[in-house]
Amino acid sequence: MVWDATNIFLFAANILTVLYILYNDAVIPLWKGKTVLSVKLRSRGRWDGYIFVGIIVLLFVSNTFFREGPFSTSVLLGIMGVLFIYICFFRSSKAVFKESGLFYALLFFPYAKIERMNLSEDGVLVIETNRQRLMLFARSEKDLEKMLAVFTTYS
């Protein structure tokens, strides 16, 4: 394996991507106590995923067939493509509700720090903390009712 700057960057990006997947799918459900509710949210930015995976595929094809680049770079690009296909198309964003707060976008927000909540007409639950605004795009009205029930019970 050739350890040039490109391969080091691709290797580090693949390791960080695997750590992200493990944290999101294995650590968050077990961390900060028992999971009260886990709700899958509507996906936003699906086209961003198509574009990003398309760029990785173009880099892979260019490196492998047209440039005849190092095999190790092709392998690392292939691994990155598989990881991002999983992230963009098979994994869905979710909000994980615990007894003391919720995980959203990899961060934990305690219920005590929530200042106000608003519900829009199109099913978006807007949660305002002292520093930021969270927008939870519920997939269905039942999911929205479940989220509101958890908020009324635990906050």
From Swiss-Prot:
TM regions (residue ranges): 8-28, 46-66, 70-90
Listed Pfam families: DUF986
Compartments reported by the entry: Cell membrane
Keywords assigned by UniProt, alphabetized: Cell membrane, Membrane, Transmembrane, Transmembrane helix
Membrane topology label: Multi-pass membrane protein
GO CC entries: plasma membrane
Protein origin, superkingdom: Bacteria
Disulfide bonds: none
Family: Belongs to the UPF0266 family.
Protein name: UPF0266 membrane protein lmo0779
Organism: Listeria monocytogenes serovar 1/2a (strain ATCC BAA-679 / EGD-e)
